[in-house]
Amino acid sequence: MDYMSAEETPTIDYLGIHEAFAESEYGITLAANVRYGKYKPAEVGNERWEELLGPDVNNLDHLVDTYHLADDFVSRTDRLQPGLLTQHDKAAIKISAIIHDWGESIIPDINYFEKTDADEAAERQAFADNLPNFYQGDDAATQELIAEATETIIFDRESRLGNIFNIIERIGYLRTGLRAAEHVREGSAPDCQSHLRWLAASVMSSDHTTRLVRQSDLLAAQHFLVLRQVDIHEAFEASRDPAIFTSLEPEQAAVRGQGLQEARVIWDAWCAGREA
């Protein structure tokens, strides 16, 4: 499908689109659910979970949180790499942030570490089937931008902009893991201590840090790593407990432990390279 040119990029009220969605039955469904729910103690309520980890762990607020991350990322890119992103690129990335999890109001959120290709396909189908209900605005240019973002960014991580948006999402995952690790380090959430340690270790055992380290052509991603270098180091330190994954099946625990070790090696090499 041919999409609009950069010169045709509309002026978008991103937060207005979100507010309209939030008031719909789909937005209300998202608002009632939390992310990283498998790590939340059963006796801890959603409000407490969100108080500890911020808006990113509310399924609805996560969309606005990602939008602000995307807005910051493109602004930093403008300063660090002028001309890398066109106005159209920036609009497509920002609208992706606002809409990317709309499908989870139909297909419940699945933890990043457990999502399969089949889960992704089901979410994509739910998104396509329900898009006319998700967005009921009558602006044709906005509708076209949403369709473009859906096809070429949200569900195509291999495209140039899809990769950039995926990096932004990974910054969000990492940031939540760092919040969890901070509570563990400070002992500020005794009602969730072991669960937050498990969450932090799960995030750090993924390839989020590795992907950011290897994305050397995106200076905004490197800038995030520099800003949070101490926090990332301390999150790895907080995840050193060898018993941290014992609640998992042995095979899963081994995979997580290996992932944590490999991510730490790559991270330490990046830090050493900066100091050389």
Please describe what each predicted stretch is.
Residues S5, T9-D13, G37-S96:
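Alpha-helical phosphate/pyrophosphate-handling elements in metalloenzyme active cores
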Residues T66, K90-D109, E169:
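His-Asp-centered metal-binding catalytic motifs of divalent-metal-dependent phosphohydrolases/nucleases
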Residues D78, I106-N111, D138, T142-Q143:
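Membrane-helix exit/interface motif
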Residues L15-E43:
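Secretory/endomembrane lumenal or extracellular ectodomains immediately following the signal peptide
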Residues I110-A126:
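Post-HEXXH active-site segment of zinc metalloproteases
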Residues I12-Y14, D156-A276:
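Divalent metal-dependent phosphate-bond-processing catalytic cores, especially two-metal-ion Mg2+/Mn2+ enzymes
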Residues E7-E25, Q81-Q87, A91-K94, Q136-L196:
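Histidine/acidic-rich helix-loop-helix segments that form or flank divalent-metal centers
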Residues A122-T142:
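Post-HExxH zinc-binding segment in Zn-dependent metallohydrolases
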